[in-house]
Amino acid sequence: MTKFHFTLSVMFAMATLAISDIPLLAQQVPSSGPQVHVVVTVEARHGTNIPVINREDVVVYQGHDRDQVTGWLPLQGDHAGLELELFLLIDDAANNSLNSQLQDLREFISSQPATTAVGVGYMREGTVQIVQNLTTDHAQADKSLRLPLGDPGASPSPYFSVTDLIKRWPETQARREILMISDGIDRFYGGGPSDPYVDTAVEQAQRAGIIIFSIYSPGVGHSGHSFWRINWGQNYLSQLSDETGAESYYLGFGPPVSFVPYLDDLTHRLAHQYLLTFIAKPEKKSGMQRIRLRTEVPNAELVTAASVYVPAGS
């Protein structure tokens, strides 16, 4: 019995050593392939104290495969303004409750770093009326803000307008981000768990690397006071923001008393962004691939787009 027990012990020890080698093999990551860039926002899981994240703290997964992180550039300090183009996108179907928030938006624009380029556009008839192209003259951007038309027919689907802006926005090396102010209601599609126009806007934004924050602001007409449509509108805004790596702001079905808390939170998030570069695992065809980010740094969460565009392998 003693010899049999000894033999089992040796076999168990050898098995344990073999199993312990598996994680080490799993940690091997590919060192060749297309390099993908994506903006990441670091937020605190609890409280407001956001930890500093270094490159070695970041882990990227495509499915079950771990990708190699090759770059992690803090977009603060010298890189903060130079790396940011910010478009305010306002729904022309918004009701007059938005009128009292224009001053909040003006002060938000004025508070941006001097090198941040700000643009202003209004969503109408499925396109964007750009009243101010991207400019670092923030006083000029302030002046371009106007009251929304308050016409339910002016914005059949805000997601048509989002897609239109993405297509017209020249690709640059800068961060490209949108603050969208709308009720989110798709008057063209209606409502339901899967809006193809929201899905298209999400995919186009992810492919272009554009982050879309949103603030719910009630619209006019019957849709503007239909709880069913309002509920779907808020869901669509949340989907658009969440899947592009941003935040959606709303409080119930009514207008907020002030945009200031939302804009302060947005400013805080912009100040804790990083440019992540990693080597992706390509498929046979180019396309969108889902990614997951992880970190073991306490009280830190990494927020980014749910999917990124990965070129085909050679």
What are these model-predicted stretches?
Residues 7-21:
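Bacterial N-terminal signal peptides
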Residues 25-314:
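Scaffold/interface architecture of coatomer-like assemblies
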